[in-house]
Amino acid sequence: MAPISIRGVKKNYGKTPVVHGVDLDIQSGEFIVILGPSGCGKSTLLRMIAGLEEITGGEIAIDGRVVNQLEPRERGCAMVFQNYALYPHMSVAENIGYALKVAGVSKAERQRRIGEVAKALSLEPFLERRPAALSGGQRQRVAMGRAMIREPKVFLFDEPLSNLDAKLRIAMRAEIRRLHRRLGATSIFVTHDQTEAMTLADRLVVMNGGRVEQVGTPEEVYHHPVSRFVAGFVGTPAMNLLEGTINDEGVFVYDQSRKVALPRERAAPLKGKRVVLGMRAEAARLVAPDAPGALTATADFIEELGASRIVHADFDGLPFAVALTEAVKVKSGDPIGIAIDYDQIHLYAADTGRIIENPVMNNAGAVHA
């Protein structure tokens, strides 16, 4: 186990900056997930930690030791890749133990440690097989075993589950979490899949455009997104976001004429300003179209998810999602009313995309990331 300190880390390709001064502290034994869309810089950051990419600026320290100038093998990290990177001509046992063989570890010690790793990952029946005779999930476990046997200070996972089908991904997520509980090693996991991120992370690091947007627990990031980007990226369905202006009466006006009456204490300081109103699908509920204060819309389509349903509504071309927690009869084309839980709304500055703090929640002791 080892803490990791990242200070002002930058990466340029030529004159093009791709990572912009990232600062991050990772505690010893913590499981961090770096989440973001393709091209956000998450894999580049991981590769800089591993030593596979040179750092343009800043400093990375692992277990208190600055590693900027160290070779990958000197950093105490083991990496698991998306494509497994197994030797096809070697057996499972040979693949797992290869790093020890190169390091000159005795055959008896190699066999002992291969046996321990194989038992931990349920690979004992497959030790004599070659990768071509394994399923995708088994190959990924071999790749994890090859990292485990090195007994690293830090595990680095670069989208390791992307090639697996949905059922295998669920199984491997559980496998990785159990592995982390057993070994306690500091782990950094990169993904664009928010389900993976939310289920695996002790803390999430959400990246966009080479910058860190937010760091927090999955619960904090989901319930208190600090930017318009995080609000729209994290969560399925994405947070409902409506851009408009707070008029002189403290009413939120969007789409030129549609109005939402906000609580006075939220609206008063923002009169005349353009803001983005955000709310999760579960912060709204269906009511009669003529109910007092209801937003009127048309049910576009209903997403059946088994234990729950999502109604995707149409506000004259503006999308809006409502999570149904009870048996409400609604079908495509029905006129609907939507009631909003104003305690769960978020307001973002339209120009910067950053959260506008809620003074009422702050006074009540709410924590904002």
From Swiss-Prot:
It catalyses: sn-glycerol 3-phosphate(out) + ATP + H2O = sn-glycerol 3-phosphate(in) + ADP + phosphate + H(+). Coiled coil: none annotated. The keyword Transport applies. One of its GO terms (molecular function) is ATP binding. Keywords: ATP-binding, Cell inner membrane, Cell membrane, Membrane, Nucleotide-binding, Sugar transport, Translocase, Transport. Pfam families: ABC_tran, OB_MalK. Residues 4-234 form the ABC transporter domain. The keyword Protease does not apply. Its EC number is 7.6.2.10. It comes from the Bacteria. GO terms for biological process: carbohydrate transport; glycerophosphodiester transmembrane transport. It is a peripheral membrane protein. One of its GO terms (cellular component) is ATP-binding cassette (ABC) transporter complex, substrate-binding subunit-containing. SUPFAM superfamilies: MOP-like, P-loop containing nucleoside triphosphate hydrolases. It is found in: Cell inner membrane. Gene3D superfamilies: 2.40.50.100, Nucleic acid-binding proteins, P-loop containing nucleotide triphosphate hydrolases. ATP binds at residues 36-43. PANTHER family: MALTODEXTRIN IMPORT ATP-BINDING PROTEIN MSMX, SN-GLYCEROL-3-PHOSPHATE IMPORT ATP-BINDING PROTEIN UGPC. The complex is composed of two ATP-binding proteins (UgpC), two transmembrane proteins (UgpA and UgpE) and a solute-binding protein (UgpB). Part of the ABC transporter complex UgpBAEC involved in sn-glycerol-3-phosphate (G3P) import. Responsible for energy coupling to the transport system. Belongs to the ABC transporter superfamily. sn-glycerol-3-phosphate importer (TC 3.A.1.1.3) family. This is sn-glycerol-3-phosphate import ATP-binding protein UgpC 1. It comes from Rhizobium johnstonii (strain DSM 114642 / LMG 32736 / 3841).
